[in-house]
């Protein structure tokens, strides 16, 4: 059973009524087909209205859905012969990041991604998808290996952020993130990054320096969570919904700002409704990205990546008051 979100409550009520009528028809000698048909038509119309007019906060809720497909879900559906690699060769193995070698339509690739859990036990094991420094160093080790053997790199981004604990800071969390940014900028192989859930702060960006950056339609990508932004700006985390509206964290906002390259459509209601169909949408975009990038040599890949990030945040015009000075 799929957990329903707050904004889906009207749909839940209608579905419940339809189910009750169907159950009643089984036990009573009454034909309620016409009534059920009307309710189903009303449900379909309401679904279209709700999912076509999602607010940024609605999308935050979908991105955080406990049953939303994870990196391993997509690896299972998109790749073959996946061999997971463990450890950073410095400290340990961080299970908040998974990565390894696989084949994508026969092409050897390296796949890396944040991995959260879907229940309490797995979330504790995966640290709720918040990596320690050794996770980022493991990712970097796999990236450098991919570069050595000329394998394209595919990164799945899905984290609230890097783990901010004392031990993580002592082991060099900020250095590990900064090192990944530096090294990813200079990789001579294609790098495709896909935001599949939450993309939070430097913890997400440490896997996000790619030639192509795509986002699932209901994913988010931001420097801080809406709750964190609200707590800083207005000293009240309960204003997270207002912050989400202001922060421009949705795929549509980021496409307009030039931060991402393509929005990957989601199945109605969110990727958690049908992981198989969602994987097909990702496959379509990923296949096209790799075809374009594999045609470029290493020097051109580095240049393209550099120019891409250099253009982010550039001012395209100056107000008259500034020009007058």
UniProtKB/Swiss-Prot annotation:
InterPro entries: Acetyl_CoA_COase_a_su, ClpP/crotonase-like_dom_sf, COA_CT_C. GO terms for cellular component: acetyl-CoA carboxylase complex. It is found in: Cytoplasm. Pathway: Lipid metabolism; malonyl-CoA biosynthesis; malonyl-CoA from acetyl-CoA: step 1/1. Residues 35-292 form the CoA carboxyltransferase C-terminal domain. It is an enzyme of class 2 (transferase). Its EC number is 2.1.3.15. Pfam families: ACCA. SUPFAM superfamilies: ClpP/crotonase. The keyword Transmembrane helix does not apply. Its main location: cytoplasm. It catalyses: N(6)-carboxybiotinyl-L-lysyl-[protein] + acetyl-CoA = N(6)-biotinyl-L-lysyl-[protein] + malonyl-CoA. Keywords: ATP-binding, Cytoplasm, Fatty acid biosynthesis, Fatty acid metabolism, Lipid biosynthesis, Lipid metabolism, Nucleotide-binding, Transferase. It comes from the Bacteria. Component of the acetyl coenzyme A carboxylase (ACC) complex. First, biotin carboxylase catalyzes the carboxylation of biotin on its carrier protein (BCCP) and then the CO(2) group is transferred by the carboxyltransferase to acetyl-CoA to form malonyl-CoA. Acetyl-CoA carboxylase is a heterohexamer composed of biotin carboxyl carrier protein (AccB), biotin carboxylase (AccC) and two subunits each of ACCase subunit alpha (AccA) and ACCase subunit beta (AccD). Belongs to the AccA family. This is Acetyl-coenzyme A carboxylase carboxyl transferase subunit alpha. It comes from Geobacillus kaustophilus (strain HTA426).
């Amino acid at each position: 059973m799929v957990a329903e979100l707050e904004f889906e409550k009207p749909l839940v009520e209608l579905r419940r009524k339809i189910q009750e009528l169907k159950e009643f028809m089984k036990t009573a000698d009454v034909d309620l087909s016409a009534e059920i048909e009307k309710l189903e038509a009303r449900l379909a119309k309401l679904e279209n209205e709700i999912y076509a007019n999602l607010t940024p906060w609605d999308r935050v809720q979908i991105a955080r859905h406990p049953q939303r497909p994870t990196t391993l879900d997509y690896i299972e559906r998109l790749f073959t012969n996946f061999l997971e690699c463990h450890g950073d060769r410095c400290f340990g193995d961080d299970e908040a990041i998974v990565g390894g070698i696989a084949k994508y339509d026969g092409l050897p690739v390296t796949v890396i991604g944040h991995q959260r859990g879907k229940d309490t036990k797995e979330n504790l094991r995966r640290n709720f998808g918040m990596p320690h420094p050794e996770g980022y160093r493991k990712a970097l080790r796999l990236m450098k290996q991919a570069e050595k053997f000329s394998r394209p790199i595919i990164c799945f981004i899905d984290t609230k952020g890097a783990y901010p604990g004392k031990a993580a800071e002592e082991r060099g969390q900020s250095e590990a993130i900064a090192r990944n940014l530096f090294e990813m900028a200079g990789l001579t192989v294609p790098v495709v990054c896909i935001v599949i859930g939450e993309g939070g702060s430097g913890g997400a960006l440490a896997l996000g320096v790619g030639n192509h950056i795509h986002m699932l339609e209901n994913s988010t990508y931001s420097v801080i969570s809406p709750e964190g932004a609200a707590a800083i700006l207005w000293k009240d985390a309960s204003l997270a919904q207002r912050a989400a509206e202001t922060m421009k964290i949705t795929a549509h906002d980021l496409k307009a700002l030039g931060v991402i390259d393509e929005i990957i459509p989601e199945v109605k209601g969110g990727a958690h409704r049908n992981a198989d169909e969602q994987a097909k949408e990702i496959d379509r975009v990923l296949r096209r990205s790799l075809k374009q990038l594999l045609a470029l040599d290493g020097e051109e890949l580095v240049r393209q990546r550099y120019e891409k990030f250099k253009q982010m945040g550039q001012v395209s015009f100056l107000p008259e008051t500034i020009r007058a000075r």
